[in-house]
Amino acid sequence: MRDPVLFAIPCFLLLLILEWTAARKLESIETAATGQPRPASGAYLTRDSVASISMGLVSIATTAGWKSLALLGYAAIYAYLAPWQLSAHRWYTWVIAIVGVDLLYYSYHRIAHRVRLIWATHQAHHSSEYFNFATALRQKWNNSGEILMWVPLPLMGLPPWMVFCSWSLNLIYQFWVHTERIDRLPRWFEFVFNTPSHHRVHHGMDPVYLDKNYGGILIIWDRLFGSFQPELFRPHYGLTKRVDTFNIWKLQTREYVAIVRDWRSATRLRDRLGYVFGPPGWEPRTIDKSNAAASLVTSR
């Protein structure tokens, strides 16, 4: 079975071109309330968009490789460990697959924002200061975490190909929520589904928006598990530490490099583990006495 994402690519490109064309008059820089320059709403920056599209093209190949690797494990789990095998011809099997993938995506996505090693695979998607359809294509190249997260699905008896198909459908749905061109939708839809308004919050680096709205298709997971945040104002997009590069290799690997640097700088095993498995931005709680004394002197 061919990946549904491949069939969706022409639609992705068409929507991207239409949005980019509409944004040509909006590429001037506006001044935010903080006095700092920021991209205008709905704007595109050519170098930023080229980087996003390039990462998306590479991710097609890397994702195919990860799926091929996962297929071996999923097939073995489905054939030898699953207590039963669900029929792909039953409608409820598709419901289980799509909802199951979405719930596990929420779980993985939340972990990816709270565990630095996994954040390193995901941060590239958040590295753009623009929020548009090109940003949707700024995908990671390391899907190992998702593959491990979805192991329960073939163990439940879902055919491996159906798991992959549901994964692709989840990804396709998420494309259209990466836009500032769509305001809020009807209340019932906003209550149940992930929407552009919800996902703008997720990409915001403002303190009130950090680590919120992890849902892929359904936003009800965020409402149930306490991570929902409504859109109160236009977010500032990007990472809390600005990334001054459009090099796609550096965008994908920068956090891994930072982890290695912090690991080497730490002198205690506890601190090293914190730098790897703690949340992004984690720092040791204890301060060297000499540094503390120096801080005390300078504070005077």
Swiss-Prot record:
The keyword Membrane applies. GO terms for cellular component: plasma membrane. It is an enzyme of class 1 (oxidoreductase). The keyword Transmembrane applies. It comes from the Bacteria. Keywords: Cell membrane, Lipid biosynthesis, Lipid metabolism, Membrane, Oxidoreductase, Steroid biosynthesis, Steroid metabolism, Sterol biosynthesis, Sterol metabolism, Transmembrane, Transmembrane helix. Its main location: membrane. It holds the Pfam family FA_hydroxylase. The chain crosses the membrane at residues 3-23, 68-88, 91-111, 147-167. GO terms for molecular function: glyceryl-ether monooxygenase activity; iron ion binding. Its EC number is 1.3.-.-. Signal peptide: none annotated. Residues 94-227 form the Fatty acid hydroxylase domain. InterPro entries: Fatty_acid_hydroxylase, Sterol_desaturase/TMEM195. It is a multi-pass membrane protein. GO terms for biological process: membrane lipid metabolic process; sterol biosynthetic process. Belongs to the sterol desaturase family. This is C-5 sterol desaturase. It comes from Mycobacterium bovis (strain ATCC BAA-935 / AF2122/97). The lineage of its organism: Bacteria, Bacillati, Actinomycetota, Actinomycetes, Mycobacteriales.
